[in-house]
C-alpha cells in the first residue's frame, strides 16, 4: 500500500495527441482527418486501464490532463460561424465525457472513473477559429473574446464537479515571471470562488528542446535554463522567475489557509477525496 492515494494519468492530453496523430500526422499513428477515430481508440484503452486500476486498488485516483482552451469566432461573425466555433470549443471535453460515460457509453466509462480534473494551459490556448489568430493574454486592450483562466476553470468545474489541478503551464522567454504572476492571480480567483484547487505544475521545470528541433531550438521556459556551451547537465536559474514564484507561493499559501474546501472533496456525495 501507499501512505497517500496513488494518482494515475493513463494517457496525457488525449485531445491534443488525437489531433496531432489523427488529424495532422504529427505523431503515431500519422493519420489525417481521423482525429475522432484516434481519440476513440485512446479512450477505449484509457477506460480499460482505469477499470483495471480501480479493481486492483479502490484507493487509486484518476487525474485527467487535458488542454484547456477557448475557441471563438471572429468579430461580427455569422450565426453559422458562431455555432461552428462553439462546437469546436466543446470538443475539448469529449475525452473526459467518454471517461464519465456521458458519450460513447459502449466504452464503459463511469462518473466514478473521474477523480481529479487536470488541465494544461499555455499562453496560446485561446484563439479565433477562422481566420486563425491567437488571443493575447497580456495585451494592453484585451480582445473582447479573451477569457480569464479562472473563468475557464470555473466552466470545467461546473461541468464535472471535481477538484481541479493546473497540470501544465509555463511561458517561453522574458515573460516567464509575468506569466507566473498571471497564473497565480488566477489561482487566487479560483480559490475565492471556493473551487477545490489542488495544485499547479510548472512544465518544464528545467528547460527542454523543441520536440521537432532537438539540437537547435530550446524554449527557455523553465525555472532553470541550459547553456549549450556548458553542456546538457548545466542548470542556470532564471532568477526573475524564481523571485516571482517565491512571492506568488506565499500569496497562494495564505489564500489556501483561509479556504475551507482544499484538502477534501465530497465525490458524488458518497466519499471524500483527500490530498
Report each predicted region and the residues it spans.
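Active-site region of glycoside hydrolase catalytic domains
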Residues: 1-176, 185, 189-199, 203-275
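Composition- and surface-driven signal marking solvent-exposed, interaction-prone regions
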Residues: 178-180
Amino acid at each position: 500500500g501507499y501512505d497517500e492515494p496513488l494518482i494515475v494519468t493513463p494517457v496525457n492530453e488525449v485531445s491534443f495527441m488525437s489531433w496531432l496523430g489523427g488529424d495532422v500526422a504529427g505523431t503515431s499513428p500519422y493519420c489525417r482527418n481521423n482525429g475522432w477515430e484516434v481519440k476513440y481508440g485512446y479512450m477505449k484503452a484509457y477506460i480499460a486501464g482505469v477499470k483495471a486500476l480501480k479493481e486492483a486498488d479502490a484507493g487509486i485516483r484518476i487525474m485527467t490532463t487535458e488542454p484547456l482552451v477557448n475557441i471563438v469566432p471572429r468579430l461580427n461573425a455569422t450565426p453559422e460561424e458562431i455555432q461552428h466555433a462553439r462546437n469546436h470549443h466543446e470538443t475539448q471535453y469529449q475525452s473526459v465525457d467518454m471517461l464519465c460515460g456521458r458519450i460513447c457509453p459502449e466504452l464503459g466509462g463511469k462518473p466514478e472513473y473521474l477523480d481529479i480534473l487536470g488541465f494544461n494551459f499555455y499562453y496560446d490556448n485561446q484563439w479565433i477559429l477562422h481566420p486563425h489568430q491567437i488571443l493575447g493574454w497580456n495585451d494592453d486592450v484585451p480582445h473582447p473574446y479573451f477569457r480569464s483562466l479562472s473563468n475557464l476553470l470555473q466552466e470545467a468545474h461546473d461541468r464535472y464537479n471535481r477538484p481541479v489541478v493546473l497540470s501544465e503551464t509555463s511561458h517561453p522567454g522574458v515573460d516567464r515571471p509575468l506569466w507566473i504572476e498571471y497564473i497565480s492571480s488566477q489561482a487566487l480567483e479560483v480559490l475565492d470562488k471556493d473551487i477545490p484547487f489542488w495544485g499547479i505544475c510548472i512544465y518544464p521545470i528545467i528547460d527542454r528542446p523543441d520536440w521537432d528541433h532537438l539540437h537547435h531550438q530550446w524554449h527557455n521556459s523553465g525555472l532553470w535554463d541550459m547553456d549549450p556551451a556548458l553542456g546538457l547537465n548545466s542548470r542556470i536559474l532564471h532568477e526573475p522567475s524564481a523571485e516571482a514564484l517565491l512571492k506568488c507561493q506565499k500569496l497562494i499559501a495564505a489564500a489556501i489557509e483561509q479556504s475551507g474546501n482544499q484538502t477534501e472533496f465530497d465525490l458524488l456525495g458518497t466519499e471524500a477525496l483527500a490530498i
